[in-house]
Amino acid sequence: MPLTTTETRSRTEDATDVPWNVVVHNDPVNLMSYVTRVFQKVFGYSQERAETHMREVHELGRSIVWTGLRERAEAYVQQLHGYLLLATVEKS
């Protein structure tokens, strides 16, 4: 049985409303102090929180630095790319 317009719209809205993660990946180029400053500037994180995420990136190879709506996550990734950080968006 085909989906009604309401059912289709509801499924589409559900798909975009799922939380999305902004993931920063380790790279061999950027200094740890630089990555910390970028997290503070882009996300408004405290020194301590920014350093925690930076350490995750450095030690684990990645860190989920933000979770929320997809559109905002994609905007954050673009900002991070502007600072030459490796960042991606993934479903939470």
Predicted regions and their residues:
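Terminal domain-initiation and capping elements
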Residues: 1-92
